């Protein structure tokens, strides 16, 4: 009798522990997905903000200024490089004349 009661309690506890781990797993996956969406949204907003090139036509000045839209680094002015992900001219971390 005592063994059956212990066995029943043990099974009940195992089920509770399994449910607790499943709940933690669901929370972890949900948290990761939420963080991923936040990062994607931030990148999309930054790209949208700076994708429109409101500056002068690049043919008029020969190069694109800071945050101007580009496809390759050669389109950007001196000390600027075309950002791989957002496709705008960003500082290339060089200093000089």
Swiss-Prot record:
Can you tell which superkingdom this protein's organism belongs to? Eukaryota
**Does this UniProt record's set of keywords contain DNA-binding?**
no
Predominant localisation class: secreted
A GO cellular component annotation in the UniProt record: extracellular region
- List cystine links: 63-77, 70-82, 76-89
Q: Which InterPro entries match?
A: Huwentoxin-1, Huwentoxin_CS1
Proregion span(s): 34-61
| Tissue distribution | Expressed by the venom gland.
For this UniProt entry, the molecular function terms from Gene Ontology, in alphabetical order, are: ion channel inhibitor activity; toxin activity
UniProt keyword list: Disulfide bond, Ion channel impairing toxin, Knottin, Secreted, Signal, Toxin
Q: What is known of its domains?
A: The presence of a 'disulfide through disulfide knot' structurally defines this protein as a knottin.
The family classification in the record reads: Belongs to the neurotoxin 10 (Hwtx-1) family. 12 (Hntx-12) subfamily.
The entry's protein name is U6-theraphotoxin-Hhn1a 4
């Amino acid at each position: 009798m005592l063994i059956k009661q212990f066995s029943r309690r043990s099974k009940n506890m195992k089920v509770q522990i399994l449910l607790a781990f499943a709940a933690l797993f669901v929370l972890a996956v949900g948290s990761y997905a939420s963080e991923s969406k936040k990062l994607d949204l931030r990148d999309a907003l930054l790209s949208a903000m700076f994708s429109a090139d409101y500056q002068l036509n690049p043919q008029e000045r020969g190069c694109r200024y800071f945050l101007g839209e580009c496809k390759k680094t050669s389109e950007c002015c001196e000390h600027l490089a075309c950002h791989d992900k957002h496709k705008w001219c960003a500082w290339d971390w060089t200093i000089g004349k």
